[in-house]
């Protein structure tokens, strides 16, 4: 992966303002990239940051988290910024866990808090060449004779 990145962005309700503030602070670094954001988060980003290329997905509880997960599994999402509210229950917790699991499984850079997001956005790999190491799961897939 080099140059323009496809970035997933999600923020729980209590973290949306944090994400908007973070995007404002890092706007110039984000402009060259494509952002795919769930529901309300995507709408807020579009309202405030017309310079960004934003593709809105469905709301997280309505399938947006799963849409981003599908993009990860298909190799179409390069990184994920997901500001999580650890203090609130989430009715779609299983969808959230599935999204986080896919980010780990496919070894994409993922930030779940602002500090990690700061480290990712300032990394030389953000605009430079980076080829993530992907584990070969062929033995797992073939364990029961699947092809």
Swiss-Prot record:
E.C. number(s) listed in UniProt: 4.2.3.3
GO terms, molecular function: methylglyoxal synthase activity
Record-listed substrate binding positions: 12, 16, 38-41, 59-60, 92
Family: Belongs to the methylglyoxal synthase family.
Keyword Lyase: yes
Native organism: Oleidesulfovibrio alaskensis (strain ATCC BAA-1058 / DSM 17464 / G20)
Residues annotated as domain MGS-like: 1-147
Name of the protein described by the UniProt record: Methylglyoxal synthase
Domain of life of the native organism: Bacteria
GO BP field: methylglyoxal biosynthetic process
Function (record text): Catalyzes the formation of methylglyoxal from dihydroxyacetone phosphate.
Signal peptide annotation: none
SMART domains in UniProt: MGS
Database matches in NCBIfam families: MGSA (TIGR00160), PRK05234.1 (NF003559)
Keywords: Lyase
UniProt-listed HAMAP family: Methylglyoxal_synth
Annotated active site: 65 (proton donor/acceptor)
GO cellular component terms listed in the entry, alphabetical order: cytosol
Catalytic reaction annotation: dihydroxyacetone phosphate = methylglyoxal + phosphate
PANTHER family: METHYLGLYOXAL SYNTHASE (PTHR30492:SF0)
Record-annotated membrane-spanning stretches: none
């Amino acid at each position: 992966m080099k140059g323009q990145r496809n970035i997933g962005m999600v923020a729980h309700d209590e973290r949306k303002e944090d994400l908007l503030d973070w995007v404002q602070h890092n706007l110039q670094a984000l402009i060259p990239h494509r952002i795919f954001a769930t529901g309300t988060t995507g709408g807020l980003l579009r309202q405030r940051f017309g310079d960004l290329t934003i593709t809105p997905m469905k709301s997280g509880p309505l399938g947006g988290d799963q849409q981003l997960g599908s993009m990860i599994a298909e190799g179409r999402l390069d990184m994920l910024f997901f500001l999580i509210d650890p203090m609130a229950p989430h009715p779609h917790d299983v969808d959230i866990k599935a999204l986080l699991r896919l980010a780990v499984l496919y070894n994409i850079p993922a930030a779940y808090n602002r500090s990690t997001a700061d480290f990712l956005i300032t990394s030389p790999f953000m605009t430079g060449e980076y080829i993530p190491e992907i584990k070969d799961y062929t033995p797992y897939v073939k364990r029961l004779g699947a092809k």
